[in-house]
Amino acid sequence: MYKVFLSIYLILGIAFGGYAQNFQYHYQILKVDSTLDAKVNPKLQKYLNAQHDKLSRELGEVIGFCETTLNSYDPASPLSNLLTDILCQQSPAYAGEAAIDHCDIAILNFGGIRSQLSAGDITIGDIYAISPFENLITYIEIKGAELRKALIRFREHGFNAAFSGAQITYISGLPSQIKIQGEPLKLDKTYMLVTINFIAEGGDDILKDIHYESTWLSNTTFRDFLIEEIKNITKSGNSITSQLDDRVIINPTR
């Protein structure tokens, strides 16, 4: 592999009331390959090795056990169900001063779930692979009418959002029934929606142009939240498992 480094010298001169420009350039071809490794600074290499070993130990810490490999795919999947269920059930405890005591519906984007969760030991590195972004847990108070606007367009966007706490039935491609926590969605009711700031700010168009009654941004990333909750599940003597359910029902015709 070769890279050409050009040093360009610009000479500007003024003569007889006009501008005269002279351009000169020099180049040198440098071979960029393994021969450069011989010039590594020993002190720098020692520092990098130490940091690499430290990071490997931290990411390799086992925090739980997964019974079967969990994959993510739309409109609902074992892994997306697991992640949104944990978010819906446990996120109120991370609200801090907001003192939020419940979650009606949790929403994540499929694009933010970047890896599967393989069967066997779960490491911190596995969770970083699933959720590598610095997205913060966000709490939203939202009227049923606005929530319905968001939910009915999930299919229009190719089922780009995963959720927990809701059930949507589609007939002939259109949402015919929406339930929140087992009850029909009420347009005038205020619901507590928990998501990540990427989505709350309009990411992937999931909640774009949706009006909120109020929002609260936590200081906890979804990744750190997930790591802590998997540790808690493990401490309680349980392993990680998930399966499909009826949160998304698609009927081809009436």
Predicted feature residues:
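Short, functionally important structural connectors and interaction interfaces within domains
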Residues: 6, 62, 71-74, 134, ...
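Acidic/histidine-rich, surface-exposed loop or edge segments in extracytoplasmic proteins
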Residues: 57-74, 206-210
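N-terminal targeting signals for Sec/Tat export/insertion, comprising classic cleavable signal peptides
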Residues: 30-58
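Generic N-terminal amphipathic/basic segments
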Residues: 19-25, 54-63
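Coil residues (strongly favoring Ser/Thr
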Residues: 7, 34, 65-69
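Bacterial Sec-dependent N-terminal signal peptides
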Residues: 1-28
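Feature captures C-terminal
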Residues: 22-33, 81-254
